[in-house]
Amino acid sequence: MEKMPAKLLFERSIIGNKGSVIGKVKDIVFDEKVGRLVSLEVEPAEHSPIMREEGRNVLIPYKLVVAIKDVVVIDETNLNRVNIRVAEH
């Protein structure tokens, strides 16, 4: 994937590679020690396939991202194989 400023990710829609609407990017989690983006903080869409707690965002591992253009595309076939946590604030 090509490089882009992190601020361009905010409020982008997230779509699964099978067509599901996942949600919107609200924040990012960056590991300064290794210099990598670790997770996307996501506000789940109403009918998103990810489990959600009312009013709480979730963290989706960045390794699921397959493309970033006008939307962020994630590998939704592996959503149930990764640890999706509730974002702490």
UniProtKB/Swiss-Prot annotation:
Domain of life of the source: Archaea
Coiled coil (residue ranges): none
Stored InterPro entries: PRC-brl_dom, PRC_barrel-like_sf
SUPFAM superfamilies reported in the protein's UniProt record: PRC-barrel domain
Protein name: Uncharacterized protein MJ1118
